[in-house]
Amino acid sequence: MTFKGFSKKDFKTMQIPGLEARMSGIQTDIQPKFRAVGEELTTYLSAKLGDEMFLHIARHQRRSVNPPESTWLAICHDKRGYKKHPHFQVGLFDNYLFIWLAFIYENEESKKIANRFLKEKKLLADLPDSFAISPDHTEEKTYPVHDGQLKATLERFRDVKKGEFLVGKIYLPDDSHLSPGKDFIKEAEMVLDELIPLYKASLQ
């Protein structure tokens, strides 16, 4: 498909009641966009990193009763899976779109990565003021990257078994960067460029 951007309808899809109905909306309306966006960004990241990257689209197969509150694509160096590795995400809650560099609870290097980020403060200090962080990919709550929550979020990621750390940028449904498609791709590439130094540091 030709990607024309994200619309308010995509956010409303994440409000559809019921697991089956919401998953149908996600599969029909959102996942084709994820496929188109993801293929472009995977190619972009592969070239930027000099390492083949692979696209994964969340399938929510563990869901049996409650519909997913968010849905996403992930880009990772591992073709078989992304959750235990540092990876990039583009996804939706019902009230914002996110572009994250994600370290979720399955990551087996959380202590090493958190300590590196805590020690090498410049890596995160150089991020734009418009960026945000999240301590939990399942929750909508985010914090501006420079508002004082960074240290506590990294320490929780390091010390708590289910701790997570996500960093990137969020967009409200009426944000002009979401469409047309070429504008969103350009914006996403700019965000990824800011996150690549963190990604590289996390792999060292």
From Swiss-Prot:
Gene3D superfamilies: Protein of unknown function DUF1054. SUPFAM superfamilies: YktB/PF0168-like. HAMAP family: UPF0637. Belongs to the UPF0637 family. This is UPF0637 protein LMHCC_1566. It comes from Listeria monocytogenes serotype 4a (strain HCC23).
